[in-house]
Amino acid sequence: MKNIPESKFNSKILLFGEYSLIYDSMALSIPFESFEGTLTFSPVKLNNEQAKESTAHMAQYAEYLKNLIQAGELKFVLDIDAFEEDIAQGIVFDSSIPQGYGVGSSGALVAALYEKYAIEKIPNTAELGNSQLIKLKEALAQMECYFHGKSSGLDPLICYMKRPMLINNKQSIDAVGMPETNINGKGGIFLIDTGMTGETQPLVNLFVEKCKEEGFLHVIKDELIPFNNNCIKSFLKGEVKDMFSNLKELSKFLLGRMSPMIPRKFRQLWKQGIETESYYLKLCGSGGGGFILGFTEDIEKAKIELKDYHIDVIHRF
């Protein structure tokens, strides 16, 4: 059995840009170090049954990639023989990243496979220019389509680059610095665990179908995208008041126009935050379950209002 260098790939959080990214909005995504995955022959996070399942899933995935290669469609050169050989030897993706939680379980796997098996791969260095980042995102998007039917490539890009990334539009990507965490800050960003998983593909399909209605696409472009983009700009500049005024509108839009993406039992909680202005909730990834993102100007007040839920604070300001 081979020894392989075991690179770790973290989960990610899409702070802003879910769904609107499909129609060329801005997006901001950050690595999330609470969860990680590694390609290995000696798993420590998975039990025997899970390890066998991981290897079997990778065998199916290898078939998908092989078909793309044989059709001359894969956007980069992949050492499929080495991948299949490692699958035969029992390689697994030893991951603590929860699936269906909107934190990039498939993105981390794609990033790990690209790093190990891509020939002449684009390196994950800070010096990459925009054209290389676009090319890399497109290659990773093609790989991730297997899991979701449609992929922007952003999740695996974050997992691979291991740094916050700002999508300005489909043709412009930058590595960015996050505003500094103020450990004594009153405000913060937090996660709520819904305790259920969400399925990305059906929800993305639902959204895309809905956008075929001219009226719905109109409000996406005239309301959702401006709220989203303004949130990103003000967050990166540290303009808290402006960010929260846009967050309130963004949260209201998601509840009013995209409620199928919000688990039913959390809709009242969502509404409560908007009404009390103690916190604002938004989707974390495609929704339907997994984590919900929350923003508050007073984390202690929000904790009292959300005392029945497990809250994980991920950033303070």
Language model feature labels by segment:
Residues 1-16, 20-22, 29-30, 40-87, ...:
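C-terminal nucleotide
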Residues 33:
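Gly/Ser-rich catalytic/binding loops embedded in alpha/beta enzyme cores
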Residues 36:
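Glycine-rich, flexible N-terminal cofactor/catalytic loop recognition
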Residues 96-108:
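Gly/Ser-rich catalytic serine loop of serine hydrolases
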Residues 104-106, 284-289:
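Glycine-rich beta-strand-to-loop/alpha-helix junction loops that act as flexible
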Residues 108-120:
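Stable alpha-helical structural segments in soluble proteins, enriched in small hydrophobic residues
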